[in-house]
Amino acid sequence: LTSGSTWHAAANIHGLHDSANISRLQHYTMKLYNELEAETGQSCGVFQPGSLYLAQTENREHQLRLQAAKAKLYGMNFHEIGRDEAERLHPLVNFDGIRCIMYEPDGGNVDPSGVTNAYAVGARQRGAEIHRFTPVTATVQQPDGSWIVETPKGNIHTPWVINAAGLWGREVAKLAGIELPLQPTEHQY
């Protein structure tokens, strides 16, 4: 597991996004990682020193103040702090010219390999089987809603199929007749 692009993902965690639904999902997963560690015994590498959001321009300040209002609506902790507190939290940053500083105490990052393996441990604890190095050639939904997953190693009958194909997720979804609007892109970080 995690031999594709997962192992080097930035894995930043924060609760706010321009979309309300994605904000709720991100906020939920920030809590989930700690629960997942406790439940499975597998470390997710959760590190939450907090995140600072800085505004140098009027437009960015306006955007951060909108984010703070959304955070309040969603019940998230995202608030303005003064320069003194920001310097205490991050003494290496030069805050000259900064108009507004917001702080998200729960912001941080996780270990993407640890998270993946914690999900795998949790799934196995609940009876899931993970078939690595087993290409799927077809999926056939049965009348009762279960699935036959066809592979070169034989067919697998299962009540659920989880598409964890990452970069190849769109192609795997097509095997089930699903058009997944997923487009892999190359990026630098």
What are these regions (language model features)?
Residues S51, R99, H187-Y189:
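Short hydrophobic/aromatic beta-strand or adjacent loop that forms the aromatic wall/cage
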Residues N59, H90-I98, V140-I148:
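A short, glycine/Asx- and small/polar-enriched loop/turn
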Residues N77, E129, E179:
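Residue-level detector of anion-binding/catalytic polar loops
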Residues L1-T6:
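Glycine-rich FAD pyrophosphate-binding loop
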Residues M102-W160, A164, W168-E171:
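Helical element adjacent to the flavin cofactor pocket in flavoenzyme catalytic cores
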Residues A10-L89:
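Dinucleotide-binding Rossmann-like beta1-alpha1 core, especially the glycine-rich loop
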Residues W7, L66, A173-G177:
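Short amphipathic alpha-helical segments
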